[in-house]
Amino acid sequence: MAIEQTAITRATFDEVILPIYAPAEFIPVKGQGSRIWDQQGKEYVDFAGGIAVTALGHCHPALVNALKTQGETLWHISNVFTNEPALRLGRKLIEATFAERVVFMNSGTEANETAFKLARHYACVRHSPFKTKIIAFHNAFHGRSLFTVSVGGQPKYSDGFGPKPADIIHVPFNDLHAVKAVMDDHTCAVVVEPIQGEGGVTAATPEFLQGLRELCDQHQALLVFDEVQCGMGRTGDLFAYMHYGVTPDILTSAKALGGGFPISAMLTTAEIASAFHPGSHGSTYGGNPLACAVAGAAFDIINTPEVLEGIQAKRQRFVDHLQKIDQQYDVFSDIRGMGLLIGAELKPQYKGRARDFLYAGAEAGVMVLNAGPDVMRFAPSLVVEDADIDEGMQRFAHAVAKVVGA
């Protein structure tokens, strides 16, 4: 007997999915490059990139080919064994960065969880069992597990789940004096995003990151860079630490690492990695052949002069459009960020209305993001075409006009 097929609509979400998201009223069904189409065939220019994930756009031929080829070979084997795609990708990351060891997980949360566990364990076994303090920053975002959401400095995400992990201190971002006031020899790690993405697209100052490096060295603490959102070419360098010239002890990567396929990584030195041993940590799916094959293909394209050297010109094209919109509608108080992670802060009269602009953008046929209630965020493909930038920003201008009532 045939099973009756019920139509899938936005209402289906409310009937079957846990209510932890509030998705748009339309359902995307197809993507190509920087364009997306919904169930009704409406086209959108995508400047959201799945929240800085689809770094090469949708359905890039090289990634599709890697997926198909590996999908016909070996999907999953578990970490009882190793596999060739994981070892190839690990070697590429090590050769391109400060790191000497890497471990693969499936999401930014998992990569950060791994980093925080390693930082604490390293301090305990190399220094003292009382060296457990983690210093992090207000408005940071590091994931949704209980540990990572507690390190993230946003109570709206971390409150309401009972006792939190102890010895986590939050201080203002870009405030080195505040860090000095709480830093001591009980500190095992300072955890920072070089660019706070969810927290408003705010970049660290060079002096701040250099100061953190010096404080960590002084107190034998590890400097952990969360580059889940700002890494993998987003800033115009492969990783943001390269732009700043400040080398962390541990770095986490996810999002763009797989170009849209779930994978994350934690990178560190051989000395720090040696604190872990078999059984210290693990993941059933982490480093599976399918994810690593796709990520390897993405890495080979992103880590090229053709891509990285083109990012600043694309950024300037976005900024020029945003400045033109601001001149016409007087809506932005600041345009900031780095590379193709761009934030546009709303003026006081539009504070709290970022999602209004987001929804109006979708109605006009362009996907954008917010970064909190007061900042519009753009995280497009790193290879977005100039024509897509121009058309998408024209659509966004129409959205702005609608919201401001022009």
Curated annotation (Swiss-Prot):
Its EC number is 2.6.1.11, 2.6.1.17. The modification N6-(pyridoxal phosphate)lysine is found at residue 255. One of its GO terms (molecular function) is identical protein binding. InterPro entries: Ac/SucOrn_transaminase_bac, AcOrn/SuccOrn_fam, Aminotrans_3, Aminotrans_3_PPA_site, Class-III_PLP-dep_AT, PyrdxlP-dep_Trfase, PyrdxlP-dep_Trfase_major, PyrdxlP-dep_Trfase_small. It is found in: Cytoplasm. Pyridoxal 5'-phosphate binds at residues 108-109, 141, 226-229, 284. GO terms for biological process: arginine biosynthetic process via ornithine; L-arginine biosynthetic process; lysine biosynthetic process via diaminopimelate and N-succinyl-2-amino-6-ketopimelate. It catalyses: N(2)-acetyl-L-ornithine + 2-oxoglutarate = N-acetyl-L-glutamate 5-semialdehyde + L-glutamate; N-succinyl-(2S,6S)-2,6-diaminopimelate + 2-oxoglutarate = (S)-2-succinylamino-6-oxoheptanedioate + L-glutamate. The keyword Cytoplasm applies. Transmembrane segments: none annotated. Binds 1 pyridoxal phosphate per subunit. One of its GO terms (cellular component) is cytoplasm. Pfam families: Aminotran_3. Its main location: cytoplasm. Its cofactor is pyridoxal 5'-phosphate. N(2)-acetyl-L-ornithine binds at residues 144, 283. Keywords: Amino-acid biosynthesis, Aminotransferase, Arginine biosynthesis, Cytoplasm, Lysine biosynthesis, Pyridoxal phosphate, Transferase. CDD domains: OAT_like. Pathway: Amino-acid biosynthesis; L-arginine biosynthesis; N(2)-acetyl-L-ornithine from L-glutamate: step 4/4; Amino-acid biosynthesis; L-lysine biosynthesis via DAP pathway; LL-2,6-diaminopimelate from (S)-tetrahydrodipicolinate (succinylase route): step 2/3. NCBIfam families: arg_catab_astC (TIGR03246), argD (TIGR00707), PRK01278.1 (NF002325), PRK05093.1 (NF003468), PRK12381.1 (NF009047). Homodimer. The reaction catalyzed by ACOAT is highly reversible. This enzyme may also transaminate ornithine. Involved in both the arginine and lysine biosynthetic pathways. This is Acetylornithine/succinyldiaminopimelate aminotransferase. It comes from Escherichia coli (strain K12).
